[in-house]
C-alpha cells in the first residue's frame, strides 16, 4: 500500500523534473537573449538571470539526487531543443518578444517552486523547503524585471500582460511553518 507521503514524494519528483528541464531551456534561451540586446545594463541583467537559472538547475538536480530520482530523459531532450532554438531566435525576433516570453515563463516558475515547497513538506522533506522558497523568490525578481521591461515598451498597452504575482513577501507568508 502506498502512503500519502509516497504519493506527495512522487508528485514532488515530477514537479522537480519539470523544473530541472525548464531551467535547462531557460539557461540556453537566456544565453541567446542577453547576446541579442544592445543596452549594456539589460545585457548584464539578463546574463545574471542566466547564471541564476543554471544555479537553480544545479540545486534542483542535487535535490533530485537526495530524493533518489533523476531527470526525465524525454523532458531533457525536448527542453534542450526548445532552449537551443529560442536562444538564437532572440537575435531575429526583436526586443519585445523575448522579454514578454521570459516574463510569462518566470511568472509560472514562481508557482512551480512554491508548489514544490508544499509537496516537500507534505512528503516529509522539510529540509529542502528553504532552498525551494529561495528559488521562488529569485524567480519573482526575474518576473518583475521582465514585466518592467515589457511595460516600458510603447506597444505594451496593446498586450495582454500575464497575471501579476502576489507580492514577494507572500511567498513566505503563505508558507509559514513549511520549513518548521
List each model region and its residues.
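Non-heme di-metal
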Residues: 1-180
